[in-house]
Amino acid sequence: MQAADSEQRHPLDHSSLGGNVLLIDDSGNLVPTKLSATGSEIKIECQASLKHNTTYHIVVTDGVKTESGDALQADQSFTDLILANPAELSPEQQELREQVDRAITQAPDAGNPVYAAEFTTQDSYAVLDAMVEISLSEAEFASVPGDETKQREFKDYYDLYRVALKAPFYLPFTKDRELEECDLNKYDLKNTCKPLFEWITTEDGAFPTKYNPTPKITDPEYKELLETDIYVPDGWDRVTQLPTVIFVHGVTGEKGTVSTMLKDFTDNGYAVVAIDMPYHGTRIRYGNADQDNPEQEISARAEKSYFINIDSPLALRSNLQQSVADFISLRSALNSLDWVKKTDVHLIGLSLGGITSVMISEFSQNHPELTFKTANFVVPGQGLTNLVLNSHTLRPETIEGVKDSSDVERSLAETLLPNICTEEATNEECIVALHEFEAESQENADAIASLKDDAWALIEPELLQGVQLTIDSSDPASFTSRQTENGQPTLLLEAVGNCGDTCEVGEYMPDTVVPNSADNNIRTGTNPLIKALDLAPITEETTFGSPIRGVVRLTTGGHGTYMFPYEGPMDETGLPSLPTGEVMDFVRDATKTQQEMVASMVDTDGAEVAITNLEHVQTQVAAENEK
């Protein structure tokens, strides 16, 4: 928006927005929104996910006023469009006119429209639905538990078998491309390791869409099988049928981390199965196929951005879609094993694994052969781009990664050192010269730091919008409707801490990795995901239901306490301390309590959540968190 008579911006009266800024579905129903405005823009935030592949309309009327009482006016181009003779309009303008007319028709009782538009949401399900169908027909185990796949015994409460899973692979970065097409040159990574930034396509190289959703399998000969760990009760005879748990690890984790929560399951006669996500554990890539050079390691452990790839949002979307497809393949392949109780399979995901598990659960719906008895999400969230940028721990890493990227540093070198960083100069020449210039004086270092701050300020708004738009079709915010409608038995654990409005030293902080909410977006974090899944608060020591669909809010520890007792109360740094002594004992008890909650949910098929120590649980629910 701009003023009609000057460059000055006139702040809008927020009280005039309601009833005059309308988001309407194709049936004429108003969509609940949160409205805000400045003198330059009106911001419409949806309070819940819009339906996929659905048409919506926006109408703004002259009832919107500035703080001085002046009514909003239409831009002249809008007025010309709606007053023109349709026969005199170009085909593009005719289509635009029809969209505007349909939008205005949806708001017959609104005031005089000064803006109207129509849009259709992505068909966010199409590609993953296609992947599910491929998994159902292709996924199978290439080996099974036996003498040759049994690993040495680590503990006395489980046996471990390591087998191979044949699962469709869609990412362009296959193992064959490591040697010839990837060299981790930090000065020019996008050009020296192009496969890392590529994305899933169709067979003909196009973007998968609802019109052509089937992705290309990039390893059609299944040269690379997924190493699958199967933990079973000690002394299992390989015949007795076992209920089974699928575990999904977090970012920088790997399938072996499941060992910290096994005992509650293997002691009770369960098998626990785990695989690695792309760029994790056994699925690491290496530049030049050089596995002996740590500088050539392409893994989330070495650099989170290799998986959370905001430099290539389509690659990030593909990484998430591949992860969902892999676990759907695992679930499908379990049906071929005689010892698996096919109707007694459960899902547990932690952190990124919790985020991914929301989508795994969603795409298991309406397929009896993919059913999960319970779905358990530990510290997940939604709105992934804004989630990262509101995370205590991920935001600083992300900002520094962007500021220190070769793109930003090359641009600064071209500005500050034009005689050195010419068009012909390589990235390495430019960036090395910039670093030398920076080291010459504190004044130079301060100037570069200030310019990097300015660059980030310009990049962040585009990052929020552009990256999130791209990854919407691999974000749990888009995938809650099927499991909610079907009443999927669900337990979600949220780390809320025990602070008041602000945290003091000695108090347990809310989740410092996946924020529970974000001030700048009502759809970011764990709380909006809880709302989207329609989960009820669980505050009592034992909750019975048939089935349970609930959330336990945790006051002790933090993001990773379900697996490890490493997050103590906040210290002087403003982050969780490393607990010792009695505090360690208390946090360790919180870990035990959380693991028992999930184990009881699984063991009772979603009928009970046992809370053995209420000291670790929020027993009073804030009004905004009530169902």
Tell me what each language-model feature is:
Residues 385-386, 398-556:
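Serine-hydrolase catalytic core
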Residues 128-129, 140-244:
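Domain-level recognition of soluble alpha/beta enzyme cores
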Residues 333-389:
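Primarily recognizes the serine-hydrolase "nucleophile elbow" in alpha/beta-hydrolase
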Residues 490-493, 497, 517, 529-627:
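C-terminal catalytic histidine-bearing segment of alpha/beta-hydrolase fold enzymes
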Residues 247-251, 350-354, 495-497:
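Glycine-rich His-Gly loop
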Residues 34, 55-57, 67-78, 130-133, ...:
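Short, solvent-exposed loop/turn and secondary-structure capping segments
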Residues 182-183, 192-225, 237-328:
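Cap/lid segment of the alpha/beta-hydrolase catalytic domain
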